[in-house]
Curated annotation (Swiss-Prot):
It comes from Caenorhabditis briggsae. It is found in: Cytoplasm, Cytoskeleton; Cytoplasm, Cytoskeleton, Microtubule organizing center, Centrosome. Residues 54-80 form a coiled coil. This is Lissencephaly-1 homolog. WD repeats lie at residues 104-145, 146-185, 189-228, 231-270, 272-313, 316-355, 358-390. The keyword Zinc does not apply.
Length: 390
């Protein structure tokens, strides 16, 4: 394809403007001479060369996305799977490529969560910050600073008005979320790294887990610890609460996973495991009390909370399983691991139905939006990614 005389003149003027605006005077004068242009010919074009360049890049990304979706659709047709238009919302799962890659943290991302109502998400990192993003546009909205060491976990209350964070600096912080983003309270009482934190469904209490072997319950109105759960003999790495708020699970480096009764303030049962690192999660809206745990032994286990027995085991990851998240309808489980993969499991068939290479380094965390078709992941590569479900 050859350019017309007018198109060549427009390109010459745009390049000349770029050279002039960026101080390349020698190249600018040489171009004027060789292209038979005068300075009067160089009218302000508003940085048209840069605009065309960025437009080409955006179009190329769109072309790549469309080609990936076309390839995926062709593969689904070849394998007899339903195409996107014929899939029900209950069958939507995350699919590549990612719609956004969020860059801003300076150290590994430790946790990602969605806001329950708005199109924003939050991420925390070993760089001691919490960042708030618009997950549809990829825009960084706010950076929360206050911790002096790695932020290990964050949670948002059901109303979406408050965020709680915990850190290696031994503190738990309560933040206003959505208005001022100010730190409202600092909760102190743990004697070592605070590794996990969660709101009770009522929003008036917070649970925290620590390397000091304890789990504490805090009244957020006063900032006081109202109860300390004891029973683990080593670092309590993670806690997660059931949707009705009556039970919570904890995973520890003492090689046990425990289930506790909040009303009775006691441990219902604990089960010894052969693994050292746990991610525990509880499917929403499930009348049967089932707990899923992911471990350093590369497996995911489903537990009967009433008996403490393993119901089944899912195996496919090739390294530590770091995070779990449930599909809103409870049909699928999403897992991420140090093998850099995100896997989608069909629970009824107990099989891995899709594997996605999610990041260039270990994938440390995952979250599934409860109403909108999005999944987010965070990684040791310091990035977060947004995945559309379809």
């Amino acid at each position: 394809m050859s350019l017309s005389e007018r198109q060549r003149e427009e390109i010459n003027r745009a390049v000349a403007e770029y050279l002039q605006n960026n101080g390349y005077s020698e190249a600018f004068n040489m171009l004027l001479k060789e292209a038979s242009l005068s300075e009067n010919d160089i009218k302000p074009l508003g940085g048209i060369l840069e605009k065309k360049w960025t437009t080409v890049l955006r179009l190329q990304r769109k072309v790549n996305d469309l080609e990936a979706k076309l390839l995926e659709s062709q593969q689904e047709i070849n394998h007899g799977a339903p195409t996107r238009d014929k899939r029900q919302a209950a069958d939507w799962i995350p699919r590549p490529p990612e719609t956004q890659k969020l860059i801003g943290h300076r150290l590994p991302v430790t946790r990602v969560i969605f806001h329950p109502l708005w199109t924003i998400m939050a991420s925390c990192s070993e760089d001691a910050t919490i960042k708030v993003w618009d997950y549809e546009t990829g825009q960084l909205e706010k950076t929360l600073k206050g911790h002096t060491d790695a932020v290990n976990d964050i949670a948002i209350d059901a109303a979406g008005k408050q965020l709680v964070s915990c850190s290696t600096d031994l503190t738990i912080k309560l933040w206003d979320f959505g208005q001022s983003y100010d730190c409202l309270k600092s909760l102190k009482g743990h004697e070592h790294t605070v590794s996990s934190v969660t709101f009770l469904p009522t929003g008036d209490f917070v649970l925290s887990a620590s390397r000091d072997h304890t789990i504490k319950q805090w009244d957020i109105s006063t900032g006081y610890c109202v109860f300390t759960f004891r029973g683990h003999n080593d670092w309590v790495r993670m806690i997660r609460i059931s949707h009705d708020g009556t039970l919570f699970a904890s995973g520890s480096l003492d090689q046990t996973v425990s289930v506790w009764s909040l009303p009775r303030k006691q441990r219902n049962w604990y089960f010894e495991i052969m693994s050292m690192r746990w991610s525990v999660s509880k499917p929403e809206g499930n009348s049967t009390h089932i707990l899923f745990s992911g471990s350093r032994d590369r497996s995911i286990k489903a537990w009967n909370i009433s008996t403490g027995e393993v119901i089944f085991t899912l195996s496919a990851h090739e390294n530590w399983v770091r995070g779990l998240a449930f599909h809103p309808k409870g049909k699928y489980l999403v897992s991420v691991a140090d093998d850099k993969m995100m896997r989608i499991w069909e629970l009824s068939a107990q099989r891995c139905m899709k594997a996605i290479e999610a990041h260039e380094h270990f994938v440390s965390t995952v979250a599934f939006h409860q109403t909108n078709p999005y999944v987010i992941t965070g990684s040791v590569d310091m990035s977060c990614k947004v995945w559309e479900c379809r």
